């Protein structure tokens, strides 16, 4: 094996070890996010919408919101392993669940590797002029959009997109949309060719 493959395997094993107390929740969340059942898409949409509705209603300042999120994450990190042993202690961990857990850990490692590559690319010393111009225009466009549209709405839409993405990919929604769009475009082209003849 190459050194990078050994490092990837070591990182995967470390991640699996670190996430071991949360594996039942991770496998359950993976099933919900990939829409193993038809109604999971509605559940994801509803939960996200309710959370953001509560955030909108409470109208917390950024510092208060970050502090509360920190407290909740610390409490969950402390209490969840104990509670999960009580709730899921009798559940048998089978090969299918282990395969899903390994798949999720592999995907997380792949995303982490991609982020490291992007970080190294974005923050290397030499940048081309085109890169600087394109990044500056992109960031200015994002700043302009952020100034025009409510930030909570933007975060809601971003969260919705991020959490719906695995299910959309798993159900081949994008593939169906692109096939339908290419079919419509091809029909329009054929219709235009017939009119020209």
Swiss-Prot record:
Keywords: Membrane, Transmembrane, Transmembrane helix
Pfam families (alphabetical): RHD_RETREG1-3 (PF24456)
Domain of life according to the entry: Eukaryota
Main location as per UniProt: membrane
GO-annotated cellular components: endoplasmic reticulum tubular network; membrane
UniProt keyword annotation of Membrane present: yes
Protein name per the record: ADP-ribosylation factor-like protein 6-interacting protein 1
């Amino acid at each position: 094996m190459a050194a990078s493959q050994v490092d990837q395997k070591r990182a995967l094993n470390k991640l699996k070890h670190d996430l071991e107390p949360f594996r039942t929740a991770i496998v359950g969340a993976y099933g919900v996010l990939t829409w193993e059942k038809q109604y999971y898409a509605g559940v994801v949409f509803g939960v996200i919408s309710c959370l953001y509705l509560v955030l909108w209603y409470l109208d917390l300042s950024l510092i208060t919101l970050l502090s509360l999120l920190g407290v909740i994450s610390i409490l969950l990190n402390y209490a969840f392993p104990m509670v999960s042993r009580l709730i899921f202690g009798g559940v048998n961990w089978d090969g299918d669940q282990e395969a899903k857990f390994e798949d999720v850990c592999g995907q997380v490692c792949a995303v982490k590797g991609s982020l490291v590559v992007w970080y190294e690319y974005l923050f290397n010393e030499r940048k081309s002029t085109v890169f600087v111009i394109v990044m500056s225009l992109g960031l200015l466009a994002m700043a302009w959009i952020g100034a025009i549209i409510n930030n909570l709405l933007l975060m809601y839409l971003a969260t919705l997109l991020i959490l719906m993405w695995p299910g959309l990919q798993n159900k081949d929604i994008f593939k169906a949309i692109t096939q339908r769009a290419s079919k419509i475009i091809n029909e329009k082209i054929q219709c235009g060719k017939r009119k020209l003849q």
